[in-house]
């Protein structure tokens, strides 16, 4: 059921890491988790135009460090850093501890699953055909190095009466392989017909257990075309006989049946010299006697 489980949670112990990294006792765990959820909702609404990919929250002792991964870091920072200072003040007020905000730039937004999903939902809200938006995003991702991508849209697509689900895939998207680097993103488009959900899976190659070093794979398509029957035995080119049950070829080929049989001939007359063994045989002409008319009718 690899297509049902969340790709990030499925790979957390293997190749992925948590987006909230802190430790809390049982008494404070629920409170801190609720604070994280509210901070994420606030940042996504505040930085909607900044193309935010993901948010990492870390809490050292009596401090907080928030890292924002964005494809447009200039929008987050603002003119002369005014916006980011206001953002720090608001986050400090919400969390109640000093907050440090770091901005990381996303180099290739075309192969980031969350940014792809957000881009498609923005196009759907502008009444662009969903098939055109999905196929354009897939082409851009494959062109910039993704090994596979799958996009699924669900809802009242194009304003139809009955909701349906459509998905397209290009390349490989191995959902069951734990070492596969699968990036997953989800977004919702709020249209006049209702909400349309968009899910994106991007396959960016395999990773080792630590999640850092990629695995270099060779092209195995040529190896798959090898002869599955195994090596052929040493035999003449004209030998096409099938092997026996034990796998061995039968013995040497005997003479052909029609080669050793001689054509039927009449015995030579007495005193006639026999034909040479190697010479051509004399042709025998057979003549059918004509029957007299009286003999045919009977006397």
From Swiss-Prot:
Alphabetical GO biological process terms: translation
Sequence segments annotated as region (Disordered): 214-299
Domain called KH type-2: residue spans: 39-107
Composition-biased stretches (Low complexity): 257-282
Pfam families reported in the protein's UniProt record: KH_2 (PF07650), Ribosomal_S3_C (PF00189)
PROSITE patterns attached to this UniProt entry: KH_TYPE_2, RIBOSOMAL_S3
GO terms for cellular component: cytosolic small ribosomal subunit
Compositional bias ranges of the Basic and acidic residues kind: 217-248
rRNA-binding is among the record's keywords: yes
Keyword terms: Ribonucleoprotein, Ribosomal protein, RNA-binding, rRNA-binding
Record-level Gene Ontology MF annotations: mRNA binding; rRNA binding; structural constituent of ribosome
Similarity comment: family membership: Belongs to the universal ribosomal protein uS3 family.
Job of this protein: Binds the lower part of the 30S subunit head. Binds mRNA in the 70S ribosome, positioning it for translation.
PANTHER family in alphabetical order: 30S/40S RIBOSOMAL PROTEIN S3, SMALL RIBOSOMAL SUBUNIT PROTEIN US3C
Self-association and partners: Part of the 30S ribosomal subunit. Forms a tight complex with proteins S10 and S14.
Protein name in the entry: Small ribosomal subunit protein uS3
Lineage, highest ranks first: Bacteria, Pseudomonadati, Pseudomonadota, Betaproteobacteria, Burkholderiales
Gene: rpsC
